């Protein structure tokens, strides 16, 4: 993860924003007092928020983890979208 100072961020803000978006890589920004914040793209932030929401419900989290385990062990069933819409 890239780390820069607030002065560097101010001097190159447009470039920094473009890099964070294109590289999908968060950047740590530190001020003179040693405080730090992280700059991420809005899409990445929204993705993290959605993941937190989905995993905040224990039942939903358990179902998602079981589904991931099934996919990793090849226990999947391929279906076409029209077939799923009929369910």
From Swiss-Prot:
GO terms for biological process: regulation of DNA-templated transcription. The keyword Repressor does not apply. Keywords: Toxin-antitoxin system. One of its GO terms (molecular function) is sequence-specific DNA binding. InterPro entries: Antitoxin_Phd/YefM, phD/YefM_antitoxin, YefM-like_sf. PANTHER family: ANTITOXIN YAFN-RELATED (PTHR33713), ANTITOXIN YEFM (PTHR33713:SF6). Antitoxin component of a type II toxin-antitoxin (TA) system. A probable antitoxin for the putative mRNA interferase YeoB. Forms a complex with YoeB which inhibits its toxin activity. Belongs to the phD/YefM antitoxin family. This is Antitoxin YefM. It comes from Synechocystis sp. (strain ATCC 27184 / PCC 6803 / Kazusa).
């Amino acid at each position: 993860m890239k780390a820069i100072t607030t002065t560097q961020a101010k001097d190159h803000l447009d470039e920094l924003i473009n890099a964070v978006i294109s590289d999908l890589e968060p950047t740590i920004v530190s001020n003179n007092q040693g405080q730090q914040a992280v700059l991420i793209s809005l899409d990445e932030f929204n993705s993290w928020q959605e993941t937190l929401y989905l995993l905040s419900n224990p039942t939903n989290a358990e179902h998602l983890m079981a589904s991931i385990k099934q996919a990793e062990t090849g226990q999947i069933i391929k279906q076409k979208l029209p077939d799923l819409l009929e369910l």
